[in-house]
């Protein structure tokens, strides 16, 4: 009897944990991440890169890779642009290779590919990624859904996602 009561209380407490508290545990705030990814602010991107590195996320490579590629488009030196882009691409693609049906990773790649210069030849997965994002939209966490809504307003590939 005591065990059942304990388990009931434990389940009740676990259900009370909010998304914000879960963010604190992992050290990763998806809303802040997507705000940085949407911005053109290198300081904000660097802040998120540091947050990802110090977080307890097990899948940080995809997020770090996307931010590095975004940062590549904002730095001044061509050498730094190429270096950051290549490093970010390796990280994001490695994550997608491990989990190629992960809609959030494909959304990150879609964002980058739609804005990547033709010279870097990184536009091959736009159709696949947009279909995967559209078909899995409802299963994604709410901060990711909000980022998709915001991004779809200016995306050719996600056009028509919203009614």
Where are the model-predicted features located?
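N-terminal leader/linker segments that initiate helical-solenoid repeat arrays
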Residues: 21-46, 58, 66-67
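Helix-turn-helix repeat elements of alpha-solenoid scaffolds
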Residues: 35-49, 81-89, 122-123
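Short coil/turn linking the two alpha-helices of tandem helical-hairpin repeats
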Residues: 38, 70-79, 115-120
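TPR/TPR-like (Sel1-like) alpha-helical repeat modules
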Residues: 83, 87-90, 121-139
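Terminal, low-structured helical/coil segments at or just beyond the last alpha-helical repeat
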Residues: 128-163
């Amino acid at each position: 009897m005591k065990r059942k009561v304990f388990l009931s209380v434990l389940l009740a407490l676990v259900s009370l944990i909010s998304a914000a508290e879960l963010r604190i545990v992992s050290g990763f705030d998806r809303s802040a991440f997507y705000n940085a990814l949407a911005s053109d602010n290198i300081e904000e991107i660097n802040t998120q890169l540091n947050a990802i590195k110090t977080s307890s996320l097990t899948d940080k490579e995809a997020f770090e890779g996307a931010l590095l590629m975004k940062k590549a488009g904002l730095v001044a030196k061509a050498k730094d642009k190429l270096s950051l882009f290549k490093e970010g691409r390796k990280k994001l693609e490695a994550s997608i290779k491990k989990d190629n049906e992960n809609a959030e990773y494909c959304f990150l790649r879609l964002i980058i590919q739609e804005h990547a210069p033709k010279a870097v030849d990184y536009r091959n997965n736009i159709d696949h990624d947009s279909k995967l994002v559209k078909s899995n939209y409802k299963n994604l966490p709410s901060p990711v859904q909000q980022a998709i809504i915001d991004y779809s307003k200016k995306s050719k590939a996600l056009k028509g996602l919203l009614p």
